[in-house]
């Protein structure tokens, strides 16, 4: 993975799909247990990585850790990620922001559960598999604390409040990141899906500077960054490329050739077969050939995986096909990998 980031030769491309609900299902545990007990999450991640020969284990599980530790109510479900109630945000009135205290990631709350997960993963697979930590981006966390509808209106009506809220969020997320880094993660993801709902001008003016601040400080902590903005982020690609992150997840609605063109040659790109169409409803051959097309569109510095999370009911053979494609890119005298059926592909040059 790190050689891909720097453009160095690799023996094969890494396979790094995001497995959350799929990992819980693979391990035979309910998702509530997965997100509330770091030991369950770690066991499921290690089992899934071993069963499918993945090149990553991840602490990403749900978007409710930071806001929950701030005091936000959480809705819990047995077999899907928890969520905040948009009808009951923590910051109902703007003045509520002034009453919030920075949560301590070591205080025993949901953030600390992730930190302990990082330490346990380091103990179990450190040095063998890269460990992906996770924090929320400024817009995503603002939606968790304030509510999506309210923060979207705030962007227009009260940018000064948005700046204050984003400043609070960045401090909180960087404290959370520091704790995960100290516990042993190798790379950190920033999830900011809500940013894809914002137009390019507002994004550039209000969101991009805070994402940039996060990336710069994470780099000062000597931690590579993986940016995850799912949805259609086509209108944000140029700015996303300017952030200087090592890796970007590109979701299915985005044209990969355009992503490479606008973000430049130096960032690693993961994606972007549609998780439902290919992994849940497709065949292993569909997955393999879809990834070959994605690889051809991205070119160098490609990381193998779907555009977003692996659906929990995906057939195991389809997830194996993701890894099969990554393994087929091993350096050989032949310029093209074997197709999943075992025949040389004629149209998917590496």
Where are these regions (language model features)?
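Acidic/polar active-site rim loop that often engages polyanionic ligands
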Residues: 92-102
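Glycine-rich, N-terminal phosphate-binding loop and its surrounding beta-alpha-beta segment
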Residues: 45-75
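Active-site loop segments of alpha/beta catalytic cores
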Residues: 1-23, 29-34, 44, 55, ...
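A cross-taxon signal for low-complexity, glycine/charged-rich
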Residues: 341-345
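Loop-to-helix transition at the N-terminal end of transmembrane alpha-helices
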Residues: 39-42
């Amino acid at each position: 993975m790190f050689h891909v980031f720097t453009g160095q030769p690799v023996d094969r491309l890494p396979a790094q799909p995001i497995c959350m609900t799929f990992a819980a299902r693979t391990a035979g545990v309910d998702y509530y247990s997965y997100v509330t007990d770091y030991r369950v999450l770690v066991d499921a991640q290690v089992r899934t990585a071993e069963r499918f020969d993945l090149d990553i284990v991840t602490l990403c599980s749900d978007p409710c850790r930071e806001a929950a530790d701030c005091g936000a109510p959480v809705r819990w479900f047995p077999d899907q990620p928890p969520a905040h109630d948009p009808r009951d945000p923590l910051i109902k009135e703007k003045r509520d922001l002034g009453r919030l205290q920075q949560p301590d990631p070591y205080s025993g709350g949901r953030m600390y559960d992730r930190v302990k997960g990082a330490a346990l993963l380091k103990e179990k697979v450190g040095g063998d598999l890269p460990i992906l930590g996770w924090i929320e981006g400024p817009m995503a966390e603002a939606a968790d604390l304030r509510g999506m509808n309210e923060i979207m209106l705030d962007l227009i009506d009260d940018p000064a409040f948005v700046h204050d809220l984003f400043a609070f969020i960045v401090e909180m997320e960087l404290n959370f990141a520091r704790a995960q880094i100290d516990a042993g993660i190798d790379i950190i993801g920033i999830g900011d899906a809500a940013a894809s709902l914002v137009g390019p001008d507002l994004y550039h003016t209000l969101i991009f500077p805070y994402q940039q601040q996060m990336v710069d400080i994470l780099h000062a902590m000597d931690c590579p960054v993986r940016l995850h903005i799912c949805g259609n982020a086509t209108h944000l690609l140029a700015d996303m490329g300017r952030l200087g992150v090592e890796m970007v997840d590109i979701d299915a609605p985005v044209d990969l050739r355009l992503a490479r063109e606008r973000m430049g040659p130096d960032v690693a790109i993961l994606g972007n077969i549609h998780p439902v169409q290919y992994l849940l409803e497709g065949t292993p051959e569909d997955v393999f050939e879809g990834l070959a097309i994605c690889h051809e569109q991205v070119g160098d510095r490609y990381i193998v995986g779907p555009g977003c999370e692996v659906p929990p009911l995906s057939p195991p053979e389809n997830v194996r096909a993701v890894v099969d494609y990554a393994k087929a890119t091993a350096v050989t005298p032949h310029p093209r990998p074997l197709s999943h059926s075992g025949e040389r592909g004629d149209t998917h040059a590496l």
